[in-house]
Amino acid sequence: YTNSDIIETWTEISHQEKKPVMLQQFASAYLPIRRGDVWISHLHGSWANEAKVTTEPLTTGMKVIKNKDGARNSHTDHAEVMISLDGKPQENQGQVIGAALCWSGNFRLRFDTLDDNFHYFFAGINEDASEYSLAPKEVFTTPELALTYSNEGLGGASRSFHRWARNGKVHNAKQPRDILLNSWEGVYFHINEKGMIQMMKDI
């Protein structure tokens, strides 16, 4: 996506054995990142406490961001991460790699930091309870991982993702869309026509 500074990567798995092969890991991408003052930013939350930004440095060992809630994962952990390469992330300056897994199901993002000069980033389907029986000559295609690079901080990476969504990744992204009115969060059990009309006017 040259108009958005986004690349997508994925993995295609096939085999020519006589019997099905059981797949147990589904990495869409692997990215080595040179060690330094590297930080990550990601979203975590829960009911009524969604999308809280967590920012932390990468240290030796393993860091895993994952979800096993299936299609209900949008209010807990998100399958996106910003990787700041030159210190604590800033909004408008600094080198940032943005990564977003294009997948609404169970996911796993993992950083392995060993005793060498790299952090190793893996992204894909969460392998917990996700085994897949791959038939001979069948092709299993993992979800895409969208990646961008910015030297304008978190904001620059975020704007690239917005352009990518508007310029074609999201179907009819520039068309007006209906809005779902969440009456439960707004009024709980006190639902009536007058209240609903007022909520719509407040949008």
List PLM regions with ranges.
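Acidic/glycine-rich phosphate/pyrophosphate-binding loops and surrounding catalytic core
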Residues: A99-F107, A146-H171
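Polysaccharide-binding surfaces and accessory modules of carbohydrate-active proteins
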Residues: Y1-D112, D128-S130
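Primarily single-stranded nucleic-acid-binding OB-fold modules
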Residues: D112-D116, G186-V187
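Active-site beta-loop-alpha junctions enriched in small/polar residues
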Residues: F26-S28, S104, L147, L181-G186
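Conserved, mostly hydrophobic/aromatic
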Residues: T11, K137, L181
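An acidic-aromatic substrate-binding cleft motif
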Residues: S160-I203
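Short Pro-Gly-centered flexible turn/kink motifs
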Residues: Y132-N151
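Short acidic, Pro/Gly- and aromatic-enriched capping/linker segments at domain boundaries
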Residues: D115-A135
